[in-house]
Amino acid sequence: MISKDDIRAILAEGTDLGPPEQFPDDADVVMDSFTLIVLQHGLEERHGVVIDPHFEDMEQFTSIDGIHAYLTALPAER
């Protein structure tokens, strides 16, 4: 299972959003196309998880909590 700390680490290492400790679970995350690619790449490299969110899924990608909720709802085969 991917933790919220895993998500924070991926975003912190691949973007200029700042250190992971500055990302509370409910903090706003600006998910532009670059940040989404960083997240997709990090999840695939570290956890073997491939995501391809649809437009309506992006509503969840506004916080660590939302991203984590999206990931935990994915079918197991991903």
Curated annotation (Swiss-Prot):
PTM note: 4'-phosphopantetheine is transferred from CoA to a specific serine of the apo-form of this carrier protein.
Superkingdom classification of source: Bacteria
UniProt-listed GO biological process terms: antibiotic biosynthetic process
Keywords noted in UniProt: Antibiotic biosynthesis, Phosphopantetheine, Phosphoprotein
Pathway(s) annotated for this protein in UniProt: Antibiotic biosynthesis
Keyword Phosphoprotein: yes
Modified residues (O-(pantetheine 4'-phosphoryl)serine): S33
InterPro entries, per the entry: ACP-like_sf
Protein biosynthesis found in the keyword field: no
Coiled coil: none
UniProt family annotation: Belongs to the acyl carrier protein (ACP) family.
Task of the protein: Involved in the biosynthesis of actinomycin. Acts as a carrier in the transfer and thioesterification of 4-methyl-3-hydroxyanthranilic acid (4-MHA).
Protein name: 4-methyl-3-hydroxyanthranilic acid carrier protein
Organism name: Streptomyces anulatus (Streptomyces chrysomallus)
